[in-house]
């Protein structure tokens, strides 16, 4: 039997407000336990919540970015459940009337070597408060409770069950991560829990309309864990059904060491939480004027920039999608092109996706911390274009520029000069190199003249070696062919 996978994601994004959603306590990560709390966060009697305007505006920004409906009237509700790090005994969330309704997120997905642009329909995005944390280490066999995180503003983003593979779910999650960090509404730090996903996974026979029984995998805080957890859960469910069993609705956790999911508890439905409107908070009213003010301050969005890169710089869909995965990288690219000229757009894209990206990954830093400024890279590209250096030598110069950590605008020129790396384009000098190589490699010359055309590659390699990589490759190839066919 063939199976279809059905996936929906719920993503918890911590909003970048300086204070909590219903109190004035700070939201700084990493403070000593229970030093960032207030009577509201601790649920002390008589303490009343007050809505954080900044959290609302970040939700509005997100809704506008995905083409959603911003509800003019939304309501906060109490989600009732017991957990040690939930001091009130309920979480303030939104149920029937969320602030963001509908919308779509588009993303690029590699399918059979081709890039497809797909989109996922969102059900909603709602505001809520985060819970505290249970600490299980260093407490002499007991569990400690840290309420610093309690009350941190969250925007929970819920999709329709539109995704059909783990790869598609990861591509969507990455696009969502790009969007919320691009907007500046979330810092996207997955290690600190600022962006974490719950995956709802089910399987059904191909062609069946009814959904299978779903299981929810909680708190996946890396894209690799998300993909591995979904793939394992899909295999588990299919094997269970094919062996005559049935999938039981449950909440599961992913164990990255064993690379498997395990049951945490039976899966709750909405009625288990006994939602009801919070009597301490009035309905949230968002006026058209408020929405217009937020929209006026919105940056260019990744999708619009991706389309502009394809249109204005003649980049491929793939190149444009990669460059717009990060606002910092996209802005750096445009700064390079502005300095080097529009004709350098494709070389700039290649360098950013190649040498620059690999160096950033190796040093585990963002483009904002790169020691090579956009204008410095632009000059390097110009020196390749005008024949001063070859692409191979440019890589050496780039490495030296990175290590130099200099703010000199002429850094590329200075290094080329000081290291003697200028490309040899003088015809007399090149001719001498070619003559010496031909004289020393009579066998390769004979093979070429006998019809083995690839023999020229060996001669080319010897000539480049003799010039220490500085010979102009195009001129060298032309000169070699001329002398070999003379």
Swiss-Prot record:
Enzyme class: ligase
Superkingdom of origin organism: Bacteria
One GO-annotated biological process of the protein: translation
Pfam family, one: GatB_N
Keyword Protein biosynthesis applies: yes
EC number in record: 6.3.5.-
Catalytic activity: L-glutamyl-tRNA(Gln) + L-glutamine + ATP + H2O = L-glutaminyl-tRNA(Gln) + L-glutamate + ADP + phosphate + H(+); L-aspartyl-tRNA(Asn) + L-glutamine + ATP + H2O = L-asparaginyl-tRNA(Asn) + L-glutamate + ADP + phosphate + 2 H(+)
PROSITE patterns: GATB
Keywords carried by this UniProt record: ATP-binding, Ligase, Nucleotide-binding, Protein biosynthesis
SMART domains per the UniProt record, alphabetical: GatB_Yqey
MF (Gene Ontology): asparaginyl-tRNA synthase (glutamine-hydrolyzing) activity; ATP binding; glutaminyl-tRNA synthase (glutamine-hydrolyzing) activity
Subunit organization: Heterotrimer of A, B and C subunits.
HAMAP family in alphabetical order: GatB
Family label: Belongs to the GatB/GatE family. GatB subfamily.
Biological role stated in the UniProt entry: Allows the formation of correctly charged Asn-tRNA(Asn) or Gln-tRNA(Gln) through the transamidation of misacylated Asp-tRNA(Asn) or Glu-tRNA(Gln) in organisms which lack either or both of asparaginyl-tRNA or glutaminyl-tRNA synthetases. The reaction takes place in the presence of glutamine and ATP through an activated phospho-Asp-tRNA(Asn) or phospho-Glu-tRNA(Gln).
Protein name: Aspartyl/glutamyl-tRNA(Asn/Gln) amidotransferase subunit B
Organism: Janthinobacterium sp. (strain Marseille)
